[in-house]
Amino acid sequence: MNSPWNIASEFDVDMSFTAEDIAGMLRDYEADCRTGMDISSIAELIYEYTSGYPFLVSRLCKLLDEGAFHSGKLKLAGGVWTEPGVQEAVRLLITEKNPLFESLSNKLGDYPKLRNVLSELLFEGKNITYNPDDEATDMAVMFGFVRICDGYVVVANRIFETRLYNMFLAGREMQETEIYKAALHDKNQFVQNGHLNMRKVLERFVEHFDELYGDQDRRFYEEDGRRYFLLYLRPIINGTGNYYIESRTRNMERTDVIVDYCGEQFVIELKVWRGNAYHERGEEQLAAYLEYYHLDRGYMLSFNFNKKKEIGVKELRIGKKMLVEAVV
């Protein structure tokens, strides 16, 4: 069956759709198909994941149109053209093989400098200034993997970002680490009646991380701590859930991970310890961020190189929000 979302080739990033462009296409589709979707909210959601990258917009909409994943659970949630439907389409898209992602992977293999820049951006949260004379950053822009925002290089969209994280984390070297093996061993204990127990995920991660890497120096905590948490998390949610990084809050001290799992959402702030005052500000920032996501519970994982730190997991109430704090 021909789909209105079929397109033959990818577009350049400078041809990106706006949220209103996407809404216009959805209005035309809705006039024909009458799905009952909330056009404005679905258009905004698709834009949030794709930043308007035309191939990704079209591919997501095609997955939704085909409804190949229209399980009973999604029917109860109101159909595929809903937030859970879009999240499931995103999960399928991120895990599929297509020419766009193959090109992205091949470019990383062909250009080591490009790979290094993207790794620093993703895992270390470095602020990389765009310099047209720098081969690696200029190449990243030319290929459409990143865009320029206020003079800095940022990954072009959430879908690219998650796919890139997965590419880095799926390398043989990463999958031979002890923390990854621990996740594979633990993964069946975290889901109860379809619900992901994020507190237990943090508790087990803290135990493993302290045992494996507790004697590492400050540089390790700053550069590799967040990488190892994502490496631990990924096999636990793989096949059912998805994650992405909130690029607006990512820097060298802080990374916010958003996890979608069976209709539930979790916000986990990963941060490098910078003292009590900075930590308390971080708690308040996370509480405010939970308000934005309409969540009552959030999670914080601090990588603390202080030898006198108190390792473990505890709960703390900030206003009306409950924070689950883990320290390694």
How would you describe each model-predicted region?
Residues 1-9:
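Short regulatory helix/loop adjacent to the ATP-binding pocket of P-loop NTPases
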Residues 229, 257-259, 263-274, 289:
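Conserved catalytic cores of phosphodiester-cleaving nucleases, focusing on short active-site segments
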